[in-house]
């Protein structure tokens, strides 16, 4: 993503919530590199990488992570939907996790001032959502966007579980009461916010929120007949129950919940959280056709892909929005977190993490090893769809399904496009849906509801009034973008980690 040929080919930047996730990937990558240093004395089995090389990569990434703290457009994302805010929370908690692991390895300390700033950024954005769990409709859950009619969707609530448990496990505390995302926020918006409360590390509130959220999520039947998580629930006029389900299936909705389940086990030692994760992962893998024995049937749509390769509905149709272009990478990022080895010894960084007995650790390892071939298969498919700039495309399975494509380009393959299942609203890739019932906006919200514009889209001064999904079509954004490359990084890092963990067991 950082090579000059890439940037000479593309000049688009990402929308803000995706930028937060891309920065999360940098921190996660630095954690993976640190684990190599810790576990292998600085050398990766079967690789020529050395400790100085790895340290150099870590430093390069960290410089960019740190600089993005000041460059992040926090004012824009602060006013977006509730899901957007939580990507920022996870972004800076992941940076803190990296710093904790690296400092424990080096017996040193990166700037404590950085840790305080990362923690405060996470605190500011968590504060936006921590009191939004609303029992007046659906018995609980968080509404996607207050500008819309009530819609309690999977991603917002999965993120609340994941961000809450991440705050409980890794947030170091924050006594800075400044509630504003930027110094100019009050003057720019003519808004005065109440001071932030002090927040202690491992505050029970975080754990309570995570448990409460997951209990509610399970009670609402977010899964279809296949066991895949659907997008969300509307509340009909005059009703209080979630009575109209959107059957749309997206890959990222199957993923974010996994890191939350892993965190809940670390905080409670309740094995049911891991068991729920194993069940969902098995469902997703089956839904890509991976376990289909007949080759001709494996090439048929299985619910979330074919030929063992994850795919979103928009991939073959080539109508993915910027949002959707990152979805698969998000899935594999959170799968990777879920499959980190269970701790059996007191961690280097003292916290609230529970310890697994030998049988539980072995069972977890066996489950995750069984996923490795499928993860690697997806990584290989992703890198097979690079263009002349070595940028990974959005539809990882195109070459397996479109034999006429041999140049890395991606275009609509309508004979492979799959009709949406009945009752599905694909609001991510068709924001015009937001103008109609049951989505009708209470104010102008199409831009805010889907995620907001990119920070630099080359579309002129009126760009901020146009939904970014329309910007994608208007500015000619191709199928190989910073977003699709970020998605590729997600699956490649996961494949690297899964393979490394298996290699380490045999050395």
Identify the function of each model-found stretch.
Residues 75, 86, 90-220, 235, ...:
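Fungal eukaryote-biased detector of long internal structured cores
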Residues 10-17, 79, 83, 88, ...:
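Extended, leucine-rich alpha-helical cores of fungal transcription factors
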Residues 222-236:
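Catalytic cores of eukaryotic secretory-pathway lumenal/extracellular enzymes that build
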Residues 159, 163-167, 203-218, 222, ...:
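Extracytoplasmic, non-cytosolic globular domains
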Residues 233-238, 245-246, 252, 304-305:
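Membrane-interfacial loop- and helix-cap regions that link adjacent transmembrane helices
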Residues 1-71, 77-83, 132, 152, ...:
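CBM-like carbohydrate-recognition segments
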Residues 30, 34, 93-103, 168-175, ...:
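Short coil/turn linking the two alpha-helices of tandem helical-hairpin repeats
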């Amino acid at each position: 993503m950082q090579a000059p040929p890439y940037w000479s080919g593309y000049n688009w930047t990402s929308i803000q919530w995706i930028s937060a996730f891309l920065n999360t990937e940098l921190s996660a990558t630095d954690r993976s590199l640190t684990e190599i240093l810790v576990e292998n004395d600085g050398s990766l089995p079967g690789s020529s990488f050395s400790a100085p090389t790895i340290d150099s990569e870590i430093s390069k990434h960290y410089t960019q992570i740190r600089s993005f703290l000041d460059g992040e457009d926090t004012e824009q994302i602060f006013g977006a939907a509730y899901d957007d805010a939580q990507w920022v929370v996870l972004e800076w908690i992941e940076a803190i996790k990296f710093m904790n692991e690296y400092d424990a390895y080096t017996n040193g300390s990166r700037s404590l001032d950085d840790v305080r700033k990362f923690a405060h950024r996470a605190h500011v954005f968590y504060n936006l959502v921590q009191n939004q769990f609303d029992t007046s409709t659906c018995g609980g859950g968080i509404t996607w966007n207050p500008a819309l009619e009530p819609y309690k969707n999977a991603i917002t609530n999965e993120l609340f579980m994941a961000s809450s448990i991440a705050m409980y496990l890794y947030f170091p505390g924050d006594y800075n009461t400044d509630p504003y995302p930027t110094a100019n926020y009050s003057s720019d918006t003519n808004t005065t916010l109440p001071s932030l409360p002090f927040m202690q590390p491992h505050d029970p509130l975080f754990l309570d929120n995570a448990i409460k959220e997951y209990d509610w999520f399970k009670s609402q039947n977010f899964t279809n007949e296949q066991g895949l998580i659907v997008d969300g629930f509307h509340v009909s006029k005059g009703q209080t129950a979630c009575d109209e389900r959107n059957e749309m299936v997206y890959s990222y909705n199957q993923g974010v919940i996994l890191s939350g389940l892993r965190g809940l086990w670390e905080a409670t030692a309740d094995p049911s959280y891991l068991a729920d994760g194993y069940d969902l992962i098995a469902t997703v893998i089956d839904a890509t056709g991976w376990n289909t024995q007949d080759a001709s049937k494996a090439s048929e749509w299985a619910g979330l892909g074919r030929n063992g390769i994850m795919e979103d509905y928009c991939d073959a149709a080539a109508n993915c929005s910027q949002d959707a272009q990152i979805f698969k990478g998000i899935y594999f990022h959170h799968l990777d977190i879920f499959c980190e080895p269970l701790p059996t010894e007191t961690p280097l960084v003292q916290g609230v993490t529970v310890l697994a007995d030998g049988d539980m650790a072995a069972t977890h390892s066996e489950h995750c090893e069984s996923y490795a071939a499928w993860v690697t298969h997806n990584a290989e498919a992703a890198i097979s769809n690079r263009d002349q700039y070595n940028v990974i495309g959005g539809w990882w399975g195109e070459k397996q399904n479109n034999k006429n494509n041999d140049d890395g380009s991606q275009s609509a393959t309508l004979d492979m496009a799959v009709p949406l299942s009945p009752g599905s609203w694909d609001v991510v890739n068709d924001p015009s849906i937001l103008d109609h019932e049951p989505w009708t906006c209470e104010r102008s919200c199409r831009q805010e509801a889907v995620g907001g514009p990119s920070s630099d889209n080359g579309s002129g001064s009126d760009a901020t009034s146009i939904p970014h999904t329309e910007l994608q079509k208007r500015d000619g954004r191709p199928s190989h973008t910073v977003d699709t490359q970020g998605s590729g990084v997600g699956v490649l890092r996961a494949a690297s980690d899964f393979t490394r963990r298996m290699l380490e067991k045999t050395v």
